[in-house]
Each structure stands twice: as structure tokens, then as C-alpha cells.
Amino acid sequence: MQCALCLVASSPPPIKRAVVARAEALPAAIGAQLLPRMVAWDAQHMASALAALRVPLLVIQCTCLNADRVRVSIEPGDDTPWLATLRRFAPHARIEVITAVGHFPQMEAPDRVNRLIEAFVADL
């Protein structure tokens, strides 16, 4: 299941169940088209969309795929292809890393996400 690829080993079981249940509730015909289209949009438009941004941008990064295509948590100072793309095309972005969570930090670490957003907004 594709959504399971967004989780890491340390993702709490209730979060894992919620993510999988939500993905399974999506009609198969929609899900089969959705992921390839999202990936294609990113490949075709992400760099230009990032470069066109003229507003403050907060990016919260938590995971990446390792060489074995397994999603793993990242640590502050780690470099990923996505972070390199952000630095190249949106050098004004504020990049924050939340460790030890999967692709859904708003579910796994809501207090940490909220603090980062509050601090970002306070600096505007």
C-alpha cells in the first residue's frame, strides 16, 4: 500500500492505522490515478512553482527515502534531494526538521508542528 510508505518504523500504531484506513477508504479508481499525477506534477512544475513564490514559506521536513527506497526519519543537518531543491529554487524558505516522525507530523507531533508554525507567523 502506497500510504504505508509514508510511515516510519517509529510511527505510532494508532497513527499507522488511521493513515492506512483513510487510504483504503479512497476509491481504488481515484487512488490509482492520484499518485502518478501528483508525482508527474512535481516533476513537471515543482521547480518553477517554488521559484515563483514571493511570499514567506515554511517547510517542515521529517522523512526521506533512503537508498533502499525505505522511508526514514531525517535529522537536522541531513541533506535530501527535496531539501536541495528547496534551497535551489526557494532560497528564502524557512526549513525546519522534526525528527522521529513519519510523513504526517501534524498527526504524530502536533505540538511540535504548532510551535513551528506559531514561531514562523510571529516572525512575519
Feature map (PLM): residue ranges:
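Short, intrinsically disordered/low-complexity patches at protein termini
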Residues: 25, 54-57, 119
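Alpha-helix boundary/capping detector
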Residues: 45-49, 61-64, 112, 121
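Catalytic active-site module of serine/aspartate enzymes centered on a nucleophile-bearing elbow/loop
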Residues: 88-124
